[in-house]
């Protein structure tokens, strides 16, 4: 229901938008990130609190990102990995349900922890996480049905910590 309302805020759809519902200072917020200004009238009408939505230009923040800079972060993600099938191509997608284990164990085929997932994403996307400040703040399973009736279960993991930019272009 809520996902559909967010998607309709960007019609006609031209680019991908990232969003999440977050708790900040004891209040629930919808945080959106997109290259387009959304039409939030449907969301306000259906779920609004009476307060007008606010938008901010993201460019000034992006301009401050440079190699070696450090940032506090909170990321709510669906950490997954794909198994390889008998033909050697991508098989099933699995949730990273293991929280942690020694790195040597984690590197075995078919193993991926929630901490290992964020480390691998960091490497691909131009940042490193401070292992001493990395925390899994919340783990939650979500279940819903697709219009076809197929049941879907997703694992949501909230990561918090400090990241350091290693490649500003890849990060942005």
Positions of the model-derived regions?
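RNA-interacting cores
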Residues: 1-172
